[in-house]
Amino acid sequence: KYEAAGQRDIVEISVSTRPDCIKTAYLDILEEVHQKTGVAVNLELGLQTANYHTLDKINRGHGLAEFIDGVLQIKEYRGFTICTHVILNLPGDTLRDAEETARILTALKIDIVKLHSLYIAKNTELCEWYENGRIAVCSKEEYFDRVIAFLELIPEGMAVERLFSRVPEEEAVFSNWGTSWWKLKDELMERMEGQHSYQGKRCHY
């Protein structure tokens, strides 16, 4: 039944899902896999933002409460880690939303976080809003401010596996302010050094 997971070279199973799709029956299966094979289990949940007004606007179909409920269900099981996906420049969000999201992930003791810079794919409703001027994307500098504030409010031990998204240029009408992700990373690191900023600087627990 769990033959594939028990192969010698497999050390972890990572399952990406929505927070409102977390069910005890699914977690029981993953726990059985973990116990019988010793393979680690990582669950990746897409929160995107703690601002439920924004989540509603972009038709996520869930709010912050569902995310918290899903995390608490997972934490009843031993041997599971939780990775959360966050977008810090969603239309309508502010610096305060980035800070609130960081504080919530810290309070919930999330293990891993992946930050995504918003990209707007062609032929989507968001693309239509963007081209019609219904939404605007914050500046690169404002995104840096949000990332820095976010990082300062999460603990040093929370692994950060991503800072920017990537998508082929031909598939999007907006992506990373027309700049390559590695250049953005270098700019961000330079700004953090200049501000004497670091992960966990304002995290007190």
Please give the residue ranges for each predicted region.
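Structural preference for beta-strand elements that scaffold enzyme active sites
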Residues: 10-16, 40-44, 81-85, 112-114, ...
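Conserved SAM/AdoMet-binding glycine-rich loop
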Residues: 1-72, 76-77
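Auxiliary Fe-S-binding modules of radical SAM enzymes
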Residues: 106, 112, 119-205
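Alpha-helix N-cap and loop-to-helix initiation/capping positions
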Residues: 58-66, 93-100, 134-142, 180-183
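Conserved strand-turn element in the central/C-terminal portion of the radical SAM core barrel
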Residues: 16-20, 46, 50-52, 74-97, ...
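Alpha-helix-loop-beta-strand connector modules within alpha/beta enzyme cores
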Residues: 1-7, 65-84, 108, 135-157
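Short, glycine/charged-enriched secondary-structure capping and boundary segments
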Residues: 28-30, 58-61, 98-99, 128-129, ...
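Catalytic cores of alpha/beta
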Residues: 25-30, 91-107, 170
